[in-house]
Structure formats: structure tokens, C-alpha cells
A protein has these predicted regions:
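Functionally critical transmembrane alpha-helices in membrane proteins and complexes, commonly lining
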Residues: 16-74, 91-93, 289-294
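Structural signal for the C-terminal ends of transmembrane alpha-helices
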Residues: 70-77, 103-109, 170-179, 196-200, ...
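Interfacial loop-to-helix transition and helix-capping segments at the boundaries
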Residues: 16-21, 47-59, 147-160, 199-216, ...
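C-terminal "closing" transmembrane helix and its immediate cytosolic amphipathic cap
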Residues: 1-12, 75, 297-358
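Juxtamembrane transmembrane-helix termini
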Residues: 2-8, 58-89, 93-116, 296, ...
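Solvent-exposed interhelical
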Residues: 162-191, 224-234, 309
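Alpha-helical transmembrane segments of multi-pass integral membrane proteins
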Residues: 242-334
Length: 358
């Protein structure tokens, strides 16, 4: 009698070199632009699903994918190499974006409507470059009298992303981090409990925001650590969809939506057709789309594009951001990532675990 084959789990099904995560991240970056189009275009509140905007869903997906990939990176690499790669992935692209915004985009707007000055531009770049202090949103008065007076309201998530990187980096110093995967699952359960308490007590602010994003990040981490036990199949994906729909209906996406979102991102990455999986495999524009989307939308608003309606405004922004994202990848991000093996940290690796280049 034939014995049914066990369901395929995440570890054997997820191919680190042939998956659709980059394509999914690109879609998520575009969804952030679409979501922001309502507020930046002056059309009112952003569309929501339950208690989360479309942009919030996208950011949650980003953090879940990062949790999966970055945890794998930390398990493979010593601390120095891990920190160096994380630095290269975030800061070169960010710093050039800040410079382009402060010394190209803002002066262009300033030439037409005034309000730009060199001290303001230097303050904007210097304050935001470390991603440590509270962020400066304006450069003089160049984006005053617009619906959202900020040059880049998307950058706030990077501080939380970096904090997650630091936590994983520190956890990697413990031998139990490698030998005891339940610690990751326990961390996810604990932070979910914290989010529940914060929601019940109606607590608001930076702590709540970080707790929610950390829960998505740790959901991805937990799927990585238990990848040899968790099935990655259509029936389980269907269950995840049902659970996610339930969180939307009950307005608890930010409390209980992390795990289904993380699972669905991974499952979708494995079932995409071959051509779709290739999107972003060589040229990953997702980060550039994310960090340049907001300033591009501000330029479009100042040019009067919001008169075309929210969806057209969003579509124009998605197209207009592509040259910025392409230049960011080709001229900044990709050259920076080629430096990941330079220096004394290059070549030192631990046993391989699932994950794409991170």
C-alpha cells in the first residue's frame, strides 16, 4: 500500500536562489505608493482593510520578509559580516536619497516657490542620515501648504527595521539562538502578547508602532527557524487567508495578522511562475521605489497631477518613481552590495540556512 508523502515544508520548498520574494517586495513598495496617494494627493484618508491601511499591510509584509531573510543571514554569518551587510543594504541608498532630495528636488521646488536654503538642506540630511534621532521632514518651506508637509514620510520605518536588525544581531551571540529555535517562536509569542496588552489599554506612540512591526519581523523569523517542520502548501495557505480575513473583519490585523501575512508572502514566493520569479532577481528596485516614492509623489502634487484623481495619481507615481529606483539600484545599491565580501569579514560563513542574499 502506498504511503502518502508528507507535505513539503518551507526548508525544502523555498529555493534561496529561485523565489519570488523580490517580486513581492516590489509589489509591496508600489502598494505603499498607492496607499499614500490618498493623503499626499489631498483625497482624504488612506484606504483601509480592517484596522490597517493598504500601506500598513505592505510594510508588514516587508518586515515579515526581512525577518525571514535577515534571521537566515545572521545564522550564516559572524557578527561583523552580518552588521556590514545590513549597513550596506540600508545606508548607501538612504544617504544618496537624502542628498538627492535635499540638493536636487527641494532646490528645484524652491526655485519655483521659494523656501530652500543650504542650512535647511544640511540640517535635513544630517539629522536623518544616522536614522537615530527623530526625523526631520521638511527642508525650509519647500513643501509647505501641501496636504502632507513632508519630503519623505516613508523613512520612519527604516529606524524600526534597523532596530530589528540590531536585535537579531545581538541574539546571534547566544549559542541557544542557533540550537534552540523555540526562542524565536517564544519571542514572537511574547511580542504578540505585548501588542495585545497595548491594544487593550489603548496605548499609542512609538512603542506600539515598534511592537507591531517587530511582531511581523519575528513572524518571518519563526517561519525560518521552523522551516523544516511547517508545511508550505496550498491548504495551509488557504487557512492563512481565512485567518487574515478574520483579522480584517475583527479589526485585529495589527494584533494577529503577522503570522498569516508572513506565511502568505513565503507561499506566494514559491508558487509564482518562472517568469514572475525572475522579477527583481537581477535588478531589485523595491528599496528604491520605497524610499523615492514619497518625494516623487510630492513633486507630482506640486505639478498638479492630483487633479486627475487618486488612482491616476497613484499610477503616475508608480511610473515616475522607476527612473529614480533604477538609478538608485544601478549606481548606488548594487555597487554597495558588491562590497559585502570586502575586508576581513569576507568569506567567513556558518552552515547554510534558507534565505536569499541579504
Amino acid at each position: 500500500m502506498d504511503i502518502a508523502a508528507p507535505p513539503k515544508t518551507i526548508t525544502p520548498r523555498f529555493d534561496p536562489r529561485d523565489n519570488g520574494l523580490n517580486a513581492i517586495r516590489l509589489v509591496l513598495a508600489f502598494l505603499v505608493i498607492v496607499s499614500h496617494s490618498w493623503s499626499l494627493g489631498g483625497f482624504g484618508e488612506e484606504p483601509t482593510l480592517g484596522d490597517a491601511t493598504i500601506g500598513s499591510f505592505a510594510v508588514g509584509g516587508f518586515f515579515a520578509i526581512s525577518g525571514f531573510l535577515v534571521t537566515g543571514s545572521r545564522l550564516r554569518l559572524p557578527a561583523g559580516a552580518y552588521a556590514w551587510r545590513r549597513f550596506l543594504r540600508i545606508f548607501p541608498g538612504l544617504w544618496v536619497c537624502l542628498l538627492v532630495t535635499a540638493f536636487v528636488l527641494a532646490p528645484t521646488v524652491g526655485a519655483l516657490r521659494g523656501g530652500w536654503s543650504l542650512p535647511d538642506a544640511l540640517r535635513y540630511t544630517g539629522r536623518n542620515a544616522p536614522m537615530v534621532f527623530s526625523l526631520t521632514n521638511e527642508i525650509g518651506t519647500t513643501v509647505r501648504n501641501v496636504p502632507v508637509p513632508s519630503w519623505n514620510g516613508s523613512l520612519w520605518t527604516l529606524r524600526h527595521e534597523i532596530a530589528c536588525y540590531v536585535l537579531v544581531g545581538l541574539a546571534g551571540f547566544s549559542g541557544m539562538f542557533r540550537s534552540k529555535p523555540w526562542l524565536t517562536a517564544g519571542g514572537f509569542g511574547a511580542i504578540t502578547g505585548v501588542v495585545v496588552v497595548l491594544a487593550v489599554t489603548d496605548t499609542r506612540g512609538l512603542v506600539v508602532t515598534f511592537a507591531v512591526l517587530l511582531s511581523f519581523f519575528l513572524a518571518g523569523s519563526a517561519l525560518l527557524r521552523y522551516g523544516d517542520r511547517i508545511p508550505l502548501t496550498a491548504p495551509v495557505a488557504g487557512l492563512a487567508m481565512v485567518l487574515l480575513a478574520a483579522t480584517i473583519a475583527t479589526h485585529t490585523v495589527k494584533i494577529f495578522g503577522a503570522l498569516p501575512v508572513a506565511y502568505l508572502c513565503l507561499w506566494t514566493a514559491t508558487v509564482l511562475s518562472g517568469q514572475l520569479r525572475k522579477v527583481g532577481s537581477r535588478n531589485d528596485l523595491s528599496y528604491g521605489v520605497y524610499i523615492y516614492g514619497f518625494p516623487v509623489q510630492q513633486l507630482l502634487f506640486l505639478a498638479g497631477a492630483s487633479s486627475l484623481g487618486p488612482l491616476t495619481f497613484a499610477g503616475l507615481a508608480c511610473v515616475a518613481v522607476l527612473p529614480f529606483a533604477a538609478m538608485s539600484w544601478l549606481l548606488v545599491e548594487r555597487p554597495a552590495m558588491r562590497m559585502k565580501t570586502y575586508g576581513r569579514w569576507g568569506g567567513f560563513t556558518h552552515r547554510a540556512l534558507p534565505g536569499t542574499a541579504a
